[in-house]
């Protein structure tokens, strides 16, 4: 797959976004040999983990940007293909929706979740959210918000359609200079404003029914956000995101235009 990364890659991973135009263009083509290699790798991988599940995911086959206006072409493939590509550094780029929560008492919420990489399973500091799925294609159009709502329900047991949550698209995560030749992720990053306090949100998470991917909520404030650098495992975008939020004081509503075709 080829992604047009002119004016996109390099410098900051967390970039401003004015509009995004999604285009769904079918399925990634793979030959018989690659299909067999993927299947064999996946069968071995499933013996090592119990939280990875096969699904049809969406990948970025092309992306362009002009003045913070993005055009993204999507194709679907299997999650096993993505993991195989990740292991072999084949450059497959998946699409994701992710979010942080802003509580009513002004904490920013990320999560600890189970993660598998480089033949190891561990917990990592991450956004809430996950890889976009074929089920997020609705009437032939990709819905990033549908992906986000689905992931919130699965990971936290929280329904984002409740009136106590307000969803705003804030940023786009693009490949860094180091990532551009490897399997990586491109995604929409949302800010979720909540009427719940830190303690209320913690109680809601503990009492809700959800999967076992997310193990804990992690709260940051203006005073302690640099504690992010003390975590053993953290998604590279998280420190940059927190620095951007707190340095620019950008906890506010942005209106981003989302198009589908």
Residue ranges with predicted function:
Residues 1-125, 131-150, 157-261:
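N-terminal leader/linker segments that precede catalytic domains of diphosphate-processing enzymes
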